[in-house]
């Protein structure tokens, strides 16, 4: 729909393929510049397919954050490999376009994988019950108070106890095919999702 009545007729689009995007509030997507070579993006970069070949491969979001409180979701649509969700520092994100660069075992990160393991600055420990095929993983990151909570289908992991992580600088959201020879598929929701959900939120301008 055009403000100047120069409307276009949609073809081969579902209802979830049509959303409102405005100059006052652009939504993040997967970043074609911060991805491994075997990451394939589609649906306006809201979907990522990562072919593992037994190695760790990653892709980040387009918009970085350095303060504030943020929430986003990812639908994980493959349960044949190990996957990781979290945040990595900008310095690490710029290296993700390498052929094989992990985001889970690095020095400035925080994340959660399908086995219920949390990662903080490269160190891992048990956290939550993990996730599987078609689960929706939510990430609530509070960079002001240095806390992160991960959700699986709306349920906070580790009884809602936040992961403590000191944030210093700028961070990107990241998903990673952590191990296995299959393909991991991710669908992102930064407010403009490629998948339908039963509930939703909007910003102060009514978008989202």
Where do the language-model regions lie?
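PRY/SPRY (B30.2) beta-sandwich protein-interaction domains
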Residues: 1-208
């Amino acid at each position: 729909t055009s403000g100047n009545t120069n409307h276009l007729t949609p073809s081969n689009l579902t209802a979830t393929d049509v959303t409102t995007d405005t100059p006052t509030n652009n939504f993040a997507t997967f970043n074609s510049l911060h991805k491994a070579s075997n990451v394939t993006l589609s649906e306006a970069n809201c979907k990522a397919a990562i072919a593992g070949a037994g190695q760790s491969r990653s892709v980040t979001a387009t918009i970085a954050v350095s303060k504030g409180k943020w929430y986003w979701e990812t639908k994980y649509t493959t349960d044949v490999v190990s996957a990781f969700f979290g945040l990595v520092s900008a310095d690490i994100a710029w290296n993700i376009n390498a052929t094989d660069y992990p985001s889970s075992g690095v020095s400035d990160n925080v994340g959660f994988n399908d086995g219920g393991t949390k990662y903080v600055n490269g160190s891992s420990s048990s956290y939550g019950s993990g996730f599987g095929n078609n689960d929706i993983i939510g990430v609530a990151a509070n960079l002001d108070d240095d806390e992160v909570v991960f959700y699986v289908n709306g349920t906070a992991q580790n009884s809602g106890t936040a992961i403590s992580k000191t944030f210093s600088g700028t961070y990107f959201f990241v998903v990673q095919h952590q191990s296995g020879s299959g393909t991991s598929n991710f669908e992102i929701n930064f407010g403009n999702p490629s998948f339908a959900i039963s509930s939703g939120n909007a910003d102060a301008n009514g978008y989202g």
